[in-house]
């Protein structure tokens, strides 16, 4: 059972918005109704006269200090730092919902009413919604320096020549949508001051230690003067890997004498003013021989980062790096540009660029298989990454690669050959199709980012162990896995290990936070090191108490035993702990601490199999069966792993078939910033979700495991697209596959 299960299902778990303090005030933004322009004048007299309003701040009142918001590890290299293009409030609005002022009031309703009473005169500027328009010679600059944020290329050599020399070439133009994370808990931060020099922030964040640093930078105060407390988090999926409302909450309390100020965003504001997934436009080429050997492929990517940089070009760059592991024995070229537009800012979202890139690669490979008459599973087996291969861009060796086994296992469970045969030569309105797609994904951010994790273990008087880690639990089950790691390594029952889920930057060992599917991989060495050290101290103390050599003793199921007679307990940990605490001379509280940097980053692999039916007349896709098979190394907790995979599959189905932020191409106004008009899949839309695992030990890992949090979403859309193509003969390269888009494509193909 998850260690946080009871607290959550009984309602005892306290999330940020559950915290109410005496004298607490509430802040609400005044936001731009236009996507690009200047606030010429502002009139807040009516708002200020409303009873209960404490203060109104505009762009003129906030520090003139640009700051970056991305949840990336800090770097000593100035050239590698994120672009600082944010301000707390701005006169130059760059997207629909940009913030120009903020109202603080005694209660939330008054703050909302007052914000609505603020009137602003606007000077509108040209609106740009696509990267193509942003790069036009006559495009209005959204930021100083132009609309091209960054561009990069990576290549294994003369890739175009290799593609041209192959027996068959395939090309494709692919487009993916802007979508929102839609985590259950919205974005909330609460800040106050206990003295004149220090600000405390309680926040729903994935990255408390990074929040501390960014708040310090935004307000130009020492980082140590900021304390960040992360409570229970109701999901993030990357949106809370940005520093969102914490700097504003900190600014407000500092200006209002240290009183508690809460900044909570509505669901509509989460759509407009937090982060989204980057929309990609990808032009791809691929060369394949008649026997199915992939000779080479190239991708040219345009990434839409929206109005502010956030994670910016790192998304496009990461997508190209992560897919390189998938089919490493071929030539590979990847070029990408990231552009500013007047859309809501895009940032990190589950998969971090990989879903977009994999959609293009796996669509092209499937089209090549169809043209060459090769089974889609066979062409992937022929080219799949294997142990001993190397990343073609970096030369990093792949020590564990279970992709062939995933394909074979999935093919058997899914009954691929039988289902594929049933889908041949179909006529009529209802047509079935099967599809498959693969992925590769890394286990942290190294070497692009510094990977560090810390752990502290303290033994209580009853022999139980408290664990403090900077790695954040945000709903994915990290605390449960951490308790298993410590319990196994020390030699105690899991029930005797308590992970302190609340991170506090004043107390908790340093860790950047939850992102990049890094948590269990990067935290594991620190937890294991601390656990081994604590075990060593326990046995040393037991040796003194029992007049034994420490070499003769070990710890099993919470009891000290002789190595040669493990079935006979000599002493319980409770008895040992009481002696360590209260013996008049020997001992002390037994504890251990470790901080370790990780310099390995193995890839995980896997695939999705899908069986679906297309109703051509209704332009509707119904998924009959879907299966994900993963190589994530040793599976630490099968139930948690299954839950992660099912959640990712559901998100992948949403991205493939339903979800899209509808943004007016001319005005930049978001037309569906709510959960009624933004179509997410609900229970009736999802089939039975199936998962399976291929457990191949990863030798670079502390416990033999690799990434699992993000990978399940990555191949789903491509597999669905490929199945729709098999069912209808129509290759649709733009997501999502909504009824409207299916109608347009089927009409062009002459099916309707």
Curated annotation (Swiss-Prot):
One GO MF term: xanthine dehydrogenase activity
Range of residues in the leader sequence: none
Cofactor binding remark: Binds 1 Mo-molybdopterin (Mo-MPT) cofactor per subunit.
Biological process annotations from GO: hypoxanthine catabolic process; purine ribonucleoside salvage
Protein family according to the UniProt entry: Belongs to the xanthine dehydrogenase family.
Cellular component terms per the entry's GO annotation: xanthine dehydrogenase complex
Subunit structure: Heterotrimer of XdhA, XdhB and XdhC.
Catalytic activity reported: xanthine + NAD(+) + H2O = urate + NADH + H(+); hypoxanthine + NAD(+) + H2O = xanthine + NADH + H(+)
Domain of life: Bacteria
SUPFAM superfamilies cross-referenced by the UniProt entry: CO dehydrogenase molybdoprotein N-domain-like, Molybdenum cofactor-binding domain
Organism: Escherichia coli O157:H7
Key word Oxidoreductase present: yes
Enzyme Commission (EC) number: 1.17.1.4
Entry function: Presumed to be a dehydrogenase, but possibly an oxidase. Participates in limited purine salvage (requires aspartate) but does not support aerobic growth on purines as the sole carbon source (purine catabolism).
Alphabetical UniProt keywords: Metal-binding, Molybdenum, NAD, Oxidoreductase, Purine metabolism, Purine salvage
Cofactor(s) the protein needs: Mo-molybdopterin
Pathway as given in its UniProt record: Purine metabolism; hypoxanthine degradation; urate from hypoxanthine: step 1/2; Purine metabolism; hypoxanthine degradation; urate from hypoxanthine: step 2/2
Protein name, as recorded: Xanthine dehydrogenase molybdenum-binding subunit
Uppermost EC category: oxidoreductase
Annotated residues for binding of Mo-molybdopterin: 206, 237, 350, 516
């Amino acid at each position: 059972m998850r260690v946080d299960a009871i607290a959550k299902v009984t309602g005892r778990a306290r999330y940020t918005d559950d915290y109410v303090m005496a004298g607490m005030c509430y802040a609400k933004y005044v936001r731009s109704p236009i996507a690009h322009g200047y606030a010429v004048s502002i009139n807040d007299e009516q708002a200020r006269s409303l009873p209960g309003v404490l203060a109104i701040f505009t762009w003129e009142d906030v520090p003139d200090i640009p700051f970056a918001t991305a949840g990336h590890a800090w770097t000593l290299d100035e050239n590698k730092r994120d672009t600082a293009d944010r301000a707390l409030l701005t006169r130059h609005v760059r997207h629909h919902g940009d913030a120009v002022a903020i109202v603080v009031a005694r209660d939330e309703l008054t703050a909302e009413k007052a914000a609505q009473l603020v009137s602003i005169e606007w000077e509108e500027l040209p609106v740009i919604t696509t990267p193509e328009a942003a790069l036009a010679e006559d495009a209005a600059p959204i930021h100083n320096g132009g609309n091209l944020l960054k561009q990069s290329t990576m290549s294994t050599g003369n890739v175009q020549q290799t593609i041209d020399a192959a027996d068959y070439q395939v090309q494709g133009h692919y487009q993916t949508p802007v979508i929102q994370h839609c985590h259950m808990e919205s974005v909330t931060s609460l800040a106050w001051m206990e003295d004149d020099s220090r600000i405390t922030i309680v926040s729903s964040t994935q990255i408390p230690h990074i929040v501390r640093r960014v708040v310090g930078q935004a307000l130009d105060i020492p980082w140590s003067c900021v304390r960040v407390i992360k409570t229970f988090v109701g999901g993030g999926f990357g949106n809370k890997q940005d520093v969102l409302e914490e700097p504003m909450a900190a600014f407000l309390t500092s200006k209002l004498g240290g009183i508690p100020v809460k900044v909570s965003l509505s669901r509509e504001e989460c759509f407009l003013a937090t982060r989204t997934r980057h929309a990609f436009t990808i032009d791809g080429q691929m060369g394949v021989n008649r026997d199915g050997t992939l000779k080479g492929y190239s991708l040219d990517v345009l990434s839409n980062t929206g109005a502010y940089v956030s994670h910016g070009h790192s998304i496009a760059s990461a997508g190209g790096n992560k897919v390189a592991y998938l089919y490493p024995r071929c030539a590979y070229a990847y070029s990408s540009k990231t552009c500013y537009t007047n859309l809501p800012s895009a940032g990190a979202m589950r998969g971090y660029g990989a879903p977009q890139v994999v959609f293009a690669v796996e669509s092209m490979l499937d089209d090549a298989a169809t043209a060459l008459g090769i089974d889609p599973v066979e062409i992937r087996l022929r080219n799949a990454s294997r142990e001993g291969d190397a990343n073609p861009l970096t030369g990093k060796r792949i020590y564990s690669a279970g992709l062939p086994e995933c394909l074979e296992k999935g093919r058997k469970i899914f009954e691929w050959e039988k289902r594929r045969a049933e889908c041949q030569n179909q006529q009529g309105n209802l047509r079935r199709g099967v599809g498959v797609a693969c992925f590769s994904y890394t286990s942290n951010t190294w070497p692009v980012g510094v990977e560090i994790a810390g752990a502290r273990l303290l033994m209580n008087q009853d022999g139980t162990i408290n664990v403090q880690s900077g790695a954040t639990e945000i709903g994915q089950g990290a605390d449960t896995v951490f308790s298993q790691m410590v319990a196994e390594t020390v030699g105690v029952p899991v029930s005797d290990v308590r992970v302190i889920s609340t991170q506090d930057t004043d107390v908790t060992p340093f860790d950047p936070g939850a992102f990049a599917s890094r948590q269990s991989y990067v935290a594991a060495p620190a937890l294991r090191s601390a656990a081994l050290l604590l075990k060593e101290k326990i046995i040393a103390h037991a040796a003194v108490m029992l007049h034994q050599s420490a070499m003769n003793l070990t710890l099993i199921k919470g009891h000290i035993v002789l190595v040669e007679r493990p079935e006979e307990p000599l002493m319980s940990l409770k008895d040992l702990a009481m002696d360590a605490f209260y013996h008049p001379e020997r001992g002390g509280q037994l504890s251990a601490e470790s901080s370790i940097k990780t310099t390995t980053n193995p890839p995980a692999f896997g695939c999705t199999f899908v069986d679906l039916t297309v109703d051509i007349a209704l332009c509707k896709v119904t998924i009959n069966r879907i299966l994900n098979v993963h190589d994530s190394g040793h599976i630490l907790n099968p139930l948690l792993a299954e839950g992660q995979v099912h959640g990712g599959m559901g998100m992948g189905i949403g991205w493939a078939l339903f979800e899209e932020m509808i943004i007016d191409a001319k005005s930049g106004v978001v037309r569906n910033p709510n959960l009624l008009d933004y179509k997410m899949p609900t229970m009736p839309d999802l089939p039975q979700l199936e998962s399976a695992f291929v457990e191949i030990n990863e030798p670079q890992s502390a416990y033999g495991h690799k990434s699992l949090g993000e990978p399940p979403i990555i191949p789903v859309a491509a597999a669905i697209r490929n199945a729709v193509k098999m069912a209808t003969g129509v290759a649709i390269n733009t997501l999502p596959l909504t009824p409207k888009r299916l109608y347009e494509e089927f009409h062009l193909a002459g099916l309707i």
